[in-house]
UniProtKB/Swiss-Prot annotation:
Signal peptide: none annotated. Cell wall formation. Catalyzes the transfer of a GlcNAc subunit on undecaprenyl-pyrophosphoryl-MurNAc-pentapeptide (lipid intermediate I) to form undecaprenyl-pyrophosphoryl-MurNAc-(pentapeptide)GlcNAc (lipid intermediate II). This is UDP-N-acetylglucosamine--N-acetylmuramyl-(pentapeptide) pyrophosphoryl-undecaprenol N-acetylglucosamine transferase. GO terms for cellular component: plasma membrane. InterPro entries: GlcNAc_MurG (IPR006009), Glyco_trans_28_C (IPR007235), GlycoTrans_28_N (IPR004276). GO terms for molecular function: UDP-N-acetyl-D-glucosamine:N-acetylmuramoyl-L-alanyl-D-glutamyl-meso-2,6-diaminopimelyl-D-alanyl-D-alanine-diphosphoundecaprenol 4-beta-N-acetylglucosaminlytransferase activity; undecaprenyldiphospho-muramoylpentapeptide beta-N-acetylglucosaminyltransferase activity. HAMAP family: MurG. It is an enzyme of class 2 (transferase). GO terms for biological process: carbohydrate metabolic process; cell division; cell wall organization; lipid glycosylation; peptidoglycan biosynthetic process; regulation of cell shape. It comes from Borreliella afzelii (strain PKo) (Borrelia afzelii). Its EC number is 2.4.1.227. It comes from the Bacteria. The gene is murG. The lineage of its organism: Bacteria, Pseudomonadati, Spirochaetota, Spirochaetia, Spirochaetales. It is a peripheral membrane protein.
Amino acid sequence: MSNKKIIFFTGGGTGGHIFPGISIIQKLKELDNEIEFFWIGKKNSIEEKLIKEQNNIKFISIPCGKLRRYFSFQNFTDFFKVIFGIIKSFYILKKYKPQIVYATGGFVSTPTIIASSLLKIKRITHEMDLDPGLATKINSKFANKIYISFKESEKYFKNHKNIIHTGSPIRKEFLTPNPKIIKQLTQNTNKPIVSILGGSLGANALNNLALCIKKDAEIYFIHQSGKNLNDLREDNYIRRQFFNAEEMASIVKFSNIIISRAGAGAIKEFANACTCTILIPFKKGSRGDQIKNAKLLKTQNACIYIDEDEILNANILKIIKETLKDKEKINTLKANIKKFNNKNSSALIAQLLIKDIKETKSK
């Protein structure tokens, strides 16, 4: 092992696989400024974009293929991409000799976890969702430790000896949201604020919903659309392709209602803010992870759940207006989603990683 303190993170595909890792790195920097950080991901990807916006995290790309549960001719070509990804990861890790490899999810993480296993480097895989994805299921076969965001996820890893319920880290900006930001975004409106958030990649179904309901003059709408729509401001509506972390923290905390997908990272941020939330989980083309996340909250009366197929029939504007008038319902939803809060997750994980580094270097 190197005399330096080095941790490699790997993961990507969506913000939900990247922001938690960034949060952990931010906390580690506060506790130990001698640690060097690297992130292995896919070239020209969302992880490359987000990591290169950070200070003191070096990004390295590897070839990677998508892991599929179904038959596709791409499985053959992607198989070789995975192999090349393992080989490149092997030589990268051999060169830098990190003490820990930390996988945050997504198929890009699997080659690096396998390579770190071959090199006997301590490796951790973190499942952010309730239901583990295929990448995490594979990673868990090679990992020394599995971190889970939901206690209920333990049942999926019955044969693994080292499972730790750490929660899912949230971005530091969400711990101290600034109320002035949402006032600036909404031009100091006195109207109730409803925010429609499509996530880091946007969401066509939510974009279409926003375009249908934004004309209601009684509500101020904030809309994160992703790159498929241009930025726009109207009398009671603001649309941005992306909001930065400080803006998003203010939006989540001070909106009257949030309409969102049901990624685990977003749910944890809503829980931290005690947000009244309408969840419309991604359904088409997904493995069902968001549906399980949302249904878990629904069973705890912690959100309003709407099936993606029912968006057009659900009369969401009516649901919004009825909810805004029902203070008791709002208070119940806020109190119940708060139970999923784990704002100390970054600190817990950072302390565990520092302990692992010390144990590794003492050998």
